[in-house]
């Protein structure tokens, strides 16, 4: 997995509910844990754009509900700054579901995807219709 080109603020924490932006059958997911987070006792794990997490499906089709799956953040409301000075923010927080190999589980991504995520996950970038 490649490093990110921008310094992304970690604006999402465990327990946050987010929109699922793919066609896997999940509509709303909740963050359970963050991959690679080594924190301090009693500190909530935080994550930002392009980070992997384990999520549980809160709303969706009956076969997807209450499942633990991997997901990556593709949009975040909190603005971040790119090295060229451009500030980017999205209207909502959104994730897409991944399998164990890091490939998308769905076949379609709804809405835009940040360029940093497309660089880190090439298969997500090839599926996205809009890359900002």
From Swiss-Prot:
Q: In the record, which residues are listed under signal peptide?
A: none
Q: How does it assemble?
A: Part of the 50S ribosomal subunit. Forms a cluster with proteins L3 and L24e, part of which may contact the 16S rRNA in 2 intersubunit bridges.
| Keyword rRNA-binding assigned | yes
Which GO molecular function terms does the record list?
large ribosomal subunit rRNA binding; structural constituent of ribosome
Q: Which organism is it from?
A: Methanocorpusculum labreanum (strain ATCC 43576 / DSM 4855 / Z)
InterPro entries the record matches:
Ribosomal_uL14, Ribosomal_uL14_arc, Ribosomal_uL14_sf
The UniProt similarity line reads: Belongs to the universal ribosomal protein uL14 family.
Q: Which SMART domains match?
A: Ribosomal_L14
Its biological function?
A: Binds to 23S rRNA. Forms part of two intersubunit bridges in the 70S ribosome.
- Name this protein carries in UniProt: Large ribosomal subunit protein uL14
> What gene is it encoded by?
rpl14
Organism superkingdom:
Archaea
